Amino acid sequence: MVSDLKFAPSFQSFVDSSFFHELSRLKLDIFKLDSDEKALYTQLDLNQFTSNVLAISLRDDSFQKPDNDEHNIILKGYLLNFNTIELFKNCNKIQFIKEKGQELLQRGLENDLNEIISFYMISFADLKKYKFYYWICMPSFQSDGATYQIISSKVIASDSDISVSFIKQNVIIACVISGVIQKATPDNLKVCEKVVFKDFSHLKDIPSAVTKNILTVWSKLSPRETYTICFLRSDESSFEAEIIINNGNNPSLKVSGWEKNGLGKLAPKSIDLSSLMDPVKIADQAVDLNLKLMKWRIAPKIDLDGIRNTKALLLGSGTLGCYVSRVLLAWGVRHISFVDNSTVSFSNPVRQSLYNFEDCGKPKAQIASEALKRIFPSVESSGYQLEIPMIGHPVTNEKKQRQDYEALEDLIKSHDVIFLLMDARETRWLPSVLGRLHNKIVINAALGFDSYLVMRHGNDDDKLGCYFCNDILAPSDSLTDRTLDQMCTVTRPGVALLAASQAVELLVTYLQPTPNVLGTSPHQIRGFLNEFKTVSQSTPEYEHCCAGNKSVISALQENGWNFVRQALDDYKCVEKLSGLSKVQEEAELALEEDFDFSEDDEFVTG
């Protein structure tokens, strides 16, 4: 009895949330603006089809081709991820699937019949809102106007020769030539007696819709009166059908296969992962988002990992320390430590962004660290309340001051970059020497009323100067016998923001490999707010520098605290060690010679 051949839907997709997490990562780090098709893979257990459709499961590992497995077959698909939601919406879905159907037809005509089964996903990833839009299709095609009829059908036993032989083949489609299973190549299709197909459907006498793909290719390669297909299934419903094809007179291709959404409509699906994700993880990814977007187009070679992995030590948790830490966070730095010996005063919160009114009276370093964690929970931040020993300030409590020195040195050893952000000039001396001794990056920022200085200290390689290289006197006590306006940092409020941002930008630029994608890395930047002007300049190291002189470095390395204690009690010992004393003596001697006039010398005027 002749009857029309009906077809069951071909597939159903199951997209795990891990797939979208991996898509987010690949989009940010690898794909960027590249919207070319990307390969996807899913594994099919050909002996375990339990539903009436093929289950296409996509997970985080679907972007990598799995290893071959004799029990499974790898089905390759493709992802087309659009860069904007408008492109996703405006994609002509009918034209898209028609083009893909035409491609699959050509593969079947030229290569192997197994290549006519594939799937395609179009998508858009909103990485800021963690919302993903997607639509999957498995093209099934036929000649426009074609009809299919079954003229005979019979059940195939699961233990039949053809079933047993086909199970051993790790394919979905094969040919039978002289009773032997063969590959479904174009040449074999022209001479085979029948085609064997691992059917996805379990409906009685109703095969999967991709059967149309088989019949279309086969009829084009080998026109004949009837076509015999063995639909082998994992249950007892396997059957063999003899089919008549009427392709009609229309040569164009008719393609269908878009998946219906949860409401049973032909429309895209969407998933919002924000509610499923840990808020801390969302924040962690969001911080990196804008940074990684730099690599898409503006600065593709920027080294973000080098910045992220840099451990920053901020000596001073005042106005500069607060702003420097915020800019470091914005650049993705994950390890920031604070050092300060003071507490939050009532004048601080309006100028120092990490403190509130409720923090007044509490230790600055600790509160700054806690505030940073509230802003970004993934940051590794600690606060240390210690007093940095100051050259020229005699020792008053040797036990405590020695502990502070040792703690400071340990902190400098364990960090990559040291920011000097303190008020007093003499506070910067010991960290400068320790930074040079342990070969650390040292960034200095200092404020005037309407000016600022940002500089990076030199090292043995670049021979650039440090904060003290222009001095002919070692720093001494600058805090005693000072009026209030001399003891407080009196500066225009905006100066600190300018200096802090440029200090971090100087570091970030310095960390980049050569050639530097962010531009030049100056030695020092001087800003003048009264003229709204900045000047970049470079100065060489000074051999008699009180902080960078080799004798001073060696003395600290060999004697440690004993040398520091001596420098605290008498700053002139550093001048002698560095050679500054001799420079001063020579200058005084030269000055005396210039003004050494004899009594007989006369000034001539006229």
Curated annotation (Swiss-Prot):
Subcellular location per the Swiss-Prot or TrEMBL entry: Cytoplasm; Preautophagosomal structure
Positions of the catalytic residues: 488
Record motif GXGXXG motif, residues: 316-321
Phenotype seen when the gene is deleted: Impairs the formation of preautophagosomal structures.
Major localization class: cytoplasm
One term under GO cellular component: phagophore assembly site
Keyword tRNA processing attributed: no
GO biological process, one term: autophagosome assembly
Record's keyword terms, sorted: Autophagy, Cytoplasm, Protein transport, Transport
UniProt entry tagged with the keyword Cytoplasm: yes
Gene3D superfamilies reported for this sequence: NAD(P)-binding Rossmann-like Domain, Ubiquitin-like modifier-activating enzyme ATG7 C-terminal domain, Ubiquitin-like modifier-activating enzyme ATG7 N-terminal domain
Any one GO molecular function term: Atg8 activating enzyme activity
Homodimerization: annotated span: 567-606
Function: E1-like activating enzyme involved in the 2 ubiquitin-like systems required for cytoplasm to vacuole transport (Cvt) and autophagy. Activates ATG12 for its conjugation with ATG5 and ATG8 for its conjugation with phosphatidylethanolamine. Both systems are needed for the ATG8 association to Cvt vesicles and autophagosomes membranes. Autophagy is essential for maintenance of amino acid levels and protein synthesis under nitrogen starvation.
Family the UniProt entry places it in: Belongs to the ATG7 family.
Note: Kluyveromyces marxianus proteins are shorter in length and have a more ordered secondary structure than their S.cerevisiae counterparts, which might contribute to the superior thermotolerance and solubility. K.marxianus could be therefore useful as a new model organism for further elucidation of the molecular details of autophagy.
Record note on domains: The C-terminal residues 567 to 606 are required for homodimerization, as well as the interactions with ATG3, ATG8 and ATG12; and the C-terminal 17 residues are required for the ATG8 lipidation. The GxGxxG motif is important for the function, possibly through binding with ATP.
Complex and partners: Homodimer. Interacts with ATG8 through a thioester bond between Cys-488 and the C-terminal Gly of ATG8 and with ATG12 through a thioester bond between Cys-488 and the C-terminal Gly of ATG12. Also interacts with ATG3.
Protein name, per record: Ubiquitin-like modifier-activating enzyme ATG7
Source species of the chain: Kluyveromyces marxianus (strain DMKU3-1042 / BCC 29191 / NBRC 104275) (Yeast)
Phylogenetic classification of the source organism: Eukaryota, Fungi, Dikarya, Ascomycota, Saccharomycotina
